[in-house]
Amino acid sequence: LISTEDRYLLDTNVVSETRKRRPDLRVGVFLEALRADQMFVSVMTLGELRKGAETRARNDREAAEELSRWLERMKEAFAARVIPVDGEVADRWGRLSATRTRPVIDTLLAATAIVHDLTLVTRNTRDVADTGARLLNPWEQ
């Protein structure tokens, strides 16, 4: 388990912000202050990004291919810092999900952050605020 201080699990909305033509300055400042070894992503984030590329391919093949190339570079950059959904994360997700209905992926990310002692960096804090996960919303910094 990852248990070092100052380590962050980046939600899809944070990672995606870096691709925008005009990313939010607060998100950029937050990410630029971190070292690479402080940033982690879940396999679920990679899945959401792949879904985005495949969905875009229906309307804009060129943009989808560019997004796919970016995703491959990101996967290489994060290679040792991609966290799977393992048995312990799944168990924590089940416990969190039993307390009330929550978005599945957001709750899996909260469970991952709890199990690996990471701070979940997300814009979607409302749905997981009562999970016990440490949360940080860079849009509110």
Regions found by a protein language model. Name each.
Residues 1-45, 55-73, 141:
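Short, well-structured N-terminal submotif of metal-dependent ribonuclease cores
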Residues 20, 51, 130:
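Phosphate-coordinating loops and pocket residues in cytosolic domains that bind phosphorylated ligands
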